[in-house]
Amino acid sequence: MNKQSKKLWHVSNAFIIPEGEILAKKLAKNSFADFVIFQNSGAEATEAAIKVARRYFYSIGKPKKNRILCVKNSFHGRTIAAIFASGSKKMTEGFGPKVSGFDHFTFGDHNSLKKKISKNTAAIMVETIMGEGGIKVIPDWCLRDLRKLCNKKKILLILDEVQCGIGRSGDFFAFESSKVKPDIVPIAKGIGGGFPIGAVLMNKKVSKAMVPGTHGSTFGGNPLAMSVGNTVMDIVSNRKFLNNVKKLFLNHYMPSLKPFFLHFEIFC
């Protein structure tokens, strides 16, 4: 960051930003993604993910498929659409009329999930590891079933990895061990290493809907943020680093957590 700060901090995204191109390629190389849009935060990345899902169905002539199905008491950010996506009264109370377009199901209740899918559902959006809702880990088999369900219903799968992605689980993405390929993934906290960066990753199919003018950001993808992201990627994408994250957890943190297992429900 110090090195880049002595050069160029910000320039209009009408110009090519080499640092951003490099970071996008690194993210694509280490993920399912074919296309990346940079933001400044997790909430922005989540809202962009919602836009991408809705725009995709609009682009293929199905504009009424615009509803996003989320988990009750999840957390997707603090902007107005994100709080209503979260399905939590404490998040939405006092913030005016309800933002429409979101439906909710109970974590772990597969019947509830299936019943809530309608002809207007565009995507299922879940946190791979729930944070605000109680550190609930979606099992690999469940992620695989979610992918199959989305394929069957011809809807998109959005895995929100803003909080748990980019090495924080000991894998580059928390969903990696499931071998699932989502359609859209918002990221933020892990890629910035403390600096405000966000991004939404997507596959080629949905990226075709995001033509010039459908989304943008004044500061998203600026040279300073991209330089930070590149440095983080060089460290966190290293397999030795990721293995050490797992080792530290098992050897140092797991023993201190064991007493809690006797008193609290374990969801993973």
List each model region and its residues.
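Conserved N-terminal phosphate-binding loop of PLP-dependent enzymes in the Aspartate aminotransferase
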Residues: 1-268
